[in-house]
Amino acid sequence: MRCLYLHGFASGPGSAKGVAFAEAFARRGVEVERLNLRVPSLAHLRLSAMIDHVVATIGAAEQVVLIGSSLGGLTAARVAERVPAVRALVLLAPAFCMAERWRARLGDDGAAWRRDGSIEVFDHAERRPARVDVGFLDDAAATDVGWPTVTAPTW
């Protein structure tokens, strides 16, 4: 059975959580593949592309477990809706209804994001400021509609 770790927003496969999961599972003889979900890039991040990337990575696998943190948790749940090979999910603070919550929280900053076309965020993987275009928010709003319908056991 394959086990994939999906990192959160502005993070990467080398995140502390991803490394901790990989090391803990390795001690038990299980390899955790830590995917890079910065697709096509952090600047032009798209939830739909993240989901497609995970689906393509799973490919013809018969069984897979997805571990997702924040945006990676949302991605994992949306993948599980589409891929019967997902046998279980471990979700850490999944970012369900993310676009809706971000719009409410950002207020004037959200309006500036739309006006300017991008917003500055802290890139945790690169440890520096970076910009993400507003297409990320629009794509998330179109892709993350309603609560995910997941039938796989979820923790």
Q: What is each stretch, according to the model?
A:
Residues M1-V39:
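Short, surface-exposed "cap/lid" segments of acyl-processing enzymes
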Residues P13, L35-A61:
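Catalytic nucleophile-loop/oxyanion-hole region of alpha/beta-hydrolase
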Residues K17-G18, R46-M50, R101-W102:
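Residues at alpha-helix caps and immediate loop-helix transition turns in enzyme cores, especially N-
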Residues I58-E62, V83, V150:
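Glycine-rich phosphate-binding loop signature in dinucleotide/nucleotide-binding domains
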Residues V64-V65, T154:
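Generic beta-sheet signal
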Residues I67-A76:
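Gly/Ala-rich beta-loop-alpha elbow adjacent to hydrolase catalytic centers
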Residues R78-R82:
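Active-site signature of alpha/beta-hydrolase-fold catalytic machinery across serine-
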Residues A85-W155:
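The alpha/beta-hydrolase serine catalytic core
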